Amino acid sequence: MTQNQTSAATPLGIKPGAQSSGVIFSLPRLRRLVAQLRFGLLPRKANGMYSAVPDAAMKRVYIQDDWPKSWKYSYTYDLEEIYGEYTNRGYAYAYDHRRKQILRLFTERLAPDARILDIAAAQGNFSIALAEMGYNVTWNDLREDLADYVRLKRERGKIDFAPGNAFELKFPAPFDAVLIAEIIEHVAHPDEFLRKAAQLVKPGGYIVMTTPNGAYFRNPLPKFSDCPDPSIYEAVQFKPNGDGHIFLIHPDEIKPLAAQAGLEVEEIALFNNPLTNGFMKMEHVLRLMPQGVVNRLEFASQHLPAPARRNFMVHMAVRFRKPVKSV
């Protein structure tokens, strides 16, 4: 691992293979974080999730009676994610934190003209954000009718559209990077899914993945590595507009899954604590808090010791790298 790669894995991430000291809390460290939170002195480091990532900007559209049902359904999510018309602040804030993680993980490694495939991109908000930052993006989803909805919202940037099963399509060349955001928890065979995604990336390229953190202390779903026969879930995967999760991947499953797919793990970032995510009946508290305070709470929670983050944080972002084979 290069010096640049090592620095990118901290302070937000977990270094693959790192050993925990077993210390959950340090009183001086906790006091320092509380003081920073109180006086708004939390640092903005170059590899932090609140630095060098543009705010969400997208063409404002308004629902029309003649829109397809899939557009109207997607629009309800855009009201929360993009346009700031909150009915669930926890969901909206969690999306914003996830978006910042995704963009950070790409911009730390890729030049602006890189080619990125966004698999299961739905209403295309990540595709549009990446395109506006100068990347050459290919939007992909099983729902072809959503492509025109993405076109309606886009103002600038290059996006190609490739609807269908990404693993069955013929692309002209491997991509510099692939994004799989909030999809692997919906498939019966996450190991096979990651392996097929890796085949779409050129050597030296990257996969950025986000998914709920299976080690979160209130997660009721099974661990993939504990399931003897994942095929029993095949009938319920890839449902259109499906919100049902099959497995939630645990951080300690990431490295074995990567090895099976021929990938290296560069960074595992755990983020979105239960308060900023609106869990544990905290939504009413979020309504009383300025978003800047919410963001500082989120930033502070990402500086907890690794064992605490592993079980306390709700979401996970991973950057994989496909190694260049030696000659």
Which residues make up each language-model segment?
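Conserved beta-strand/loop positions that form the S-adenosyl-L-methionine
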Residues: 119
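Conserved glycine-rich SAM-binding loop
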Residues: 122
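A short acidic, Gly/Pro-enriched loop at the edge of an enzyme's catalytic core
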Residues: 167-178
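A short beta-strand submotif of the Rossmann-like class I SAM-dependent methyltransferase core
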Residues: 180-183
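S-adenosyl-L-methionine-dependent methyltransferase catalytic module, highlighting the catalytic core
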Residues: 28-42, 46-97, 142-149, 153-154, ...
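Conserved alpha-helix/loop element of class I SAM-dependent methyltransferases that forms part
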Residues: 94-112
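Class I SAM-dependent methyltransferase SAM/SAH-binding core
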Residues: 125, 129-168
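Nucleotide donor/acceptor-binding cores
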Residues: 113-114, 164
